[in-house]
A protein has these predicted regions:
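Mature catalytic core of soluble alpha/beta enzymes
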Residues: 2-280
C-alpha cells in the first residue's frame, strides 16, 4: 500500500490509495467523498481540506456548542501545519527533506534525523522483517512508473534489474543513540510512501486532541481515523466496491477511537501487453 509523499502536480496531480475507497458518511445519509468540501449548516461541525502527501486530506471536527466553531477552525489549521511539517521531513520529492538527505549521503556518512523520522524508519524495518522482505523502504531508486491518465509509463526490465541492485532494507542502519540513519551502499534511496502516511495523519489527530477537540475525523486518501462521535452518532465510513466504484460494499460505524485503511489498483493503473500494472 503505497502513497506518494508530496507528488509534484506535473507527475499526476492528486494521487490516492484505493482498493476500496474509504469515504466518510457525514450526517444521517450524506455521502461525502474525499476531496469534497461541504459548507456545514451546523456551526458545531467544521470541515476543511488540504492537499498533502499527493492526496486530499479532509478534517472534520465537532463540538457541542456553536460558540466553539472558531476554536475548531484554529485547531484544524494547527493540525494541517503539523502534517505539512512532517511531510516535508519525509518526502522523497523534496531535495531538502531528511529522506532525500539520507539518499544523497548513501555510502558516505550517517545523517542526523528527527525523532519523528527515526520512528517511521524503525517501523519500516519492522514491516520489512514481518513481511519477510516483501515491504522494503529502500525502493527509492525504482521511480520509472507513472499511472496517471495520459502519463502512463513503466521502466524497462533492464532498468528494474539495475534498480533492484540498490534495494535492500538490511543496508539501512539506524543509530538511536546518535540519532542518525545511514544507507551503506552508494546510490541507494528511501521511499517511505508505504509507511509514512498513517503516522502523519495520527500526528494531525493528536494536535486536535491537544487542542481540546473531542470529536474528529481525519481522512487521507483512503486512510480514515476517528475520535469520539459525530453529534452523538458513530462516524460512518463507507467502503466502495472496486468492481463497481459507484456502489458501496458496506458501511463501518466507528466510535471512540478507530482506523480504517484501504488501498487498491482499480483507479491508478493501466494495461500494457495484456498485463495490468498498478501503484501497489
Amino acid at each position: 500500500m503505497n502513497t506518494d509523499l508530496r507528488m509534484p502536480m506535473g507527475e499526476g496531480g492528486l494521487s490516492r490509495r484505493r482498493f476500496a475507497l474509504a469515504l466518510p458518511l457525514l450526517g444521517a445519509c450524506a455521502l461525502v467523498a474525499p476531496g469534497d468540501v461541504l459548507a456545514s449548516a451546523d456551526p458545531r461541525v467544521q470541515r476543511a481540506s488540504r492537499v498533502l502527501m499527493g492526496t486530499r486530506v479532509d478534517l472534520v471536527t465537532a463540538a457541542t456548542d456553536a460558540r466553539d466553531a472558531r476554536a475548531l477552525q484554529v485547531a484544524m489549521q494547527a493540525a494541517f501545519t503539523e502534517m505539512a511539517r512532517l511531510e516535508a521531513l519525509m518526502s522523497r520529492y523534496r531535495s531538502d527533506s531528511e529522506v532525500s538527505r539520507i539518499g544523497a549521503a548513501s555510502g558516505l556518512r550517517p545523517v542526523p534525523v528527527s525523532p519523528e523520522v527515526m520512528a517511521v524508519l524503525r517501523q519500516a524495518q519492522r514491516l520489512h522483517r514481518g513481511s519477510a522482505g516483501a515491504f522494503d523502504p529502500t525502493i527509492g531508486t525504482l521511480r520509472g512508473w507513472h499511472f496517471e491518465p495520459g502519463q502512463e509509463a513503466a521502466p524497462s526490465p533492464a532498468e528494474i534489474t539495475q534498480g533492484l541492485r540498490l534495494v535492500d532494507a538490511r543496508a539501512l542502519v539506524l543509530d538511536d543513540a546518535a540519532g542518525t540513519a545511514y544507507l551503506t551502499q552508494r546510490g541507494m534511496a528511501l521511499d517511505l510512501g508505504g509507511v509514512a502516511k498513517l503516522p502523519i495523519l495520527q500526528a494531525g489527530l493528536q494536535v486536535l486532541e491537544r487542542a481540546g477537540v473531542a470529536h474528529a475525523l481525519v481522512n487521507g486518501g483512503g486512510d480514515v481515523l476517528v475520535l469520539g462521535s459525530l453529534q452523538g452518532r458513530p462516524w460512518r465510513v463507507g467502503v466502495r466496491d472496486p468492481a463497481a466504484p459507484a456502489q458501496l460494499m458496506g458501511v463501518l460505524e466507528l466510535e471512540g477511537r478507530g482506523v480504517v485503511a484501504s488501498s487498491g489498483d482499480y483507479e491508478r493503473g493501466f494495461v500494457r501487453a495484456g498485463r495490468r500494472l498498478h501503484h501497489i
